[in-house]
Amino acid sequence: MIEHYGNGPFAFQGFPTPLFADIIRINCFRQRATKSLPIIETEDLTYEAYEILNRIQSFSSEQWAESKLPSRREEWTLLGNIRQAAVALYCIHSLQSISVLPLIPFLRESCFLHSQQLQRLLKRAIPLPSLRLFMLWPLVVLGVEAVNGDLSMQAFVQEKLSELSRYTGMLAPLTAKDVLERFWNSGRTDWDSCFERPYAFIMVPAVDVSKLS
């Protein structure tokens, strides 16, 4: 699927193909880990999970943007950096939630650094009409990280989700805001406690990104 559609104008909601592939791998891991697995197989999953995380963190947005028009390359690089930070946070949080990745200080520090970078990048991207529609999922991921006591980050996520709803006239950002606020007040911190059922946090069914390329 990725090889067939990855270079098309509707390319996975603006996701760099390698990062989108890693999201698919993470979701497959989550499905496998929900089954009763022998300890040795669980250890293998942990090793593979670290490989995925290392690959995400080694992704180069600058190289990805090189194939784009020079006039839009800076925006593509910004989008790639946002996706990279959000996917790294998703990888850690969602795999810790099912005990594939451990709850250790090193990964907590990684989440802190990725979230700080993601917040800085979102401040730059959300005002840009060409990137705005791609920002809902990264904001949701940042909101999950904000459960760890960062009230200023929670306020930022609330504000920007409300802005997205006003900019677009869509309800999805407000739905995300409600979900996150319930999570922040729940006393829980794991990824799966945030989402009691599946949600599709996208702004539109398919965004034509051909005018950015």
PLM regions with names:
Residues 159-213:
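Intrinsically disordered, low-complexity regulatory regions with latent secondary structure
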